[in-house]
Amino acid sequence: MFDYRNHAGIDRAHGFIRGWTVTSAAAHNGTQLRNVVTKDNTASTVWADSAYRSKTNEEWLRDNGLKSDIHQRKPKGKPMPETMSRANGRRSKIRSAVEHVFARQKDKMKLFIRTIGISRARVKIGMANIAYNMLRYVFHEAKRATA
């Protein structure tokens, strides 16, 4: 494997990474939902892109008392209905917070994984996740101090 993926669950209110896992890029996103959604999640709604939508994930969320607000896929061979498009647009406003985390790690923190083996990649990505949370903590503390 030469490419790795960081799957992260983000706290919507404060932007902290609450749960994360690292897989090879070949692994399907949908299988990682249970690893990034923490059981102590105070919010009852889970937002994710359409790769995480499956019957097993929907059942798991329902069984754990969580509401699914996962993007819906376009019907094959048909245009996306307007209502579905608007619903996905509403979801994107919230889900984009996760993309901001990855963008910050890549651009500002210069995260670039050039390791051999997933265990080394996991350590490097894990350290980047911890550093990101520390930056968020400093941001919130500075914001609180000026208030």
Give the residues covered by each predicted segment.
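Structured core elements
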Residues: 7-9, 21, 47, 69, ...
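Basic, amphipathic alpha-helical segments enriched in Lys/Arg and hydrophobic/aromatic residues
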Residues: 59, 64, 86-147
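Short hydrophobic/aromatic-enriched beta-strand-loop microsegments
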Residues: 64-72
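Polybasic low-complexity intrinsically disordered regions
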Residues: 1-64
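Short, glycine-/Ser/Thr-/acidic-enriched flexible segments
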Residues: 15, 51-53, 75-76, 132-135
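Short, charged, surface-exposed secondary-structure boundary motifs
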Residues: 31, 56, 77-84
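Short, acidic/turn-prone active-site loops that include or flank metal/cofactor-
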Residues: 22, 72-76
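Short C-terminal domain-edge/linker segments immediately following a structured domain
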Residues: 39-41, 50-52, 76-79, 100-101, ...
